[in-house]
Amino acid sequence: FAVMLERANAGGRNGTALYARRLLALLGIGLAHALLVWSGDILLTYALLGFVLLLCFRRTPVSRLPKWGVALFVLPLLLTFAMAGFATLAAQDPQAAAEFQKGMAAQAQQIAALADGERLAVGAGSYADAVAQRATDTGAMLGFLVFFAPTLLGVFLFGAWFMRSGTIRDSAAHLPLFRRLRNIGFGIGLPLMLWSAWTHPTMSF
C-alpha cells in the first residue's frame, strides 16, 4: 500500500484516489472469493484494513509510524494476557468460574455449529447452499477481525515506515538495522516457536 501511494504521488497522480479505487477492487475480489470459493480469504481483510490505514494513518508523521506499529502489534498480546489473568481469577471463585466456563462452552458450540453447517452445505448441499454457508462463515470471520486486526495493522505500519523513511530504497545504507532486526527476530521468535511446537504439537479444530 505504501509503495503504491508513494509512486503515485511521485508521478504527480492523486495517490489517495488511486489507492481507494484499488482497495475497492481488492474488496470486490476478496468478497467474491470468500463467497464463491473459500470463506477464509485474506484479501477481504486486507482491503478493509487498507481503508483503515487510509482514513487513520495517511497523514501520520513518518517518525510515529513504528510507534503506532509496535503499539498495535502488542495490543492483542496484552489482551490475551488480560484474558488469561481474568480466567485465573475466575477460577478462584466458583460462581465466576462457572460463568466463564459457560461462556467458553457457548462459544465452542457456535464454532462447532459453523463447522457442522459447512460440512453439510459443502458435502451434501447444492452450490447455492455452499455460497449461503460461506456468507455466514465470512460474517463470523469478520466478527473476529477485532482480535487480529491490530496485529495486521501494526505490520502494515512497519512496512509503511520502511517505505516512507527511505530504508527500503537505500537498503545498503541500513544493513546494520536489517541485521539487528534479523537477530532480534530469530532470538525471540525461534525459541518461542520451538516452545510452542514442544508444548502444543497438535491442535484440535
Model-derived features: where do they sit?
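Membrane helical hairpin/interfacial module
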Residues: 1-43
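Specific transmembrane alpha-helix
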Residues: 1-3, 44-57, 147-170
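Hydrophobic alpha-helical membrane segments of integral membrane proteins
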Residues: 35-52, 63-71
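Long hydrophobic alpha-helical segments that form multi-pass transmembrane helix bundles
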Residues: 71-150, 154
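Membrane-interface interhelical connector segments
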Residues: 199-205
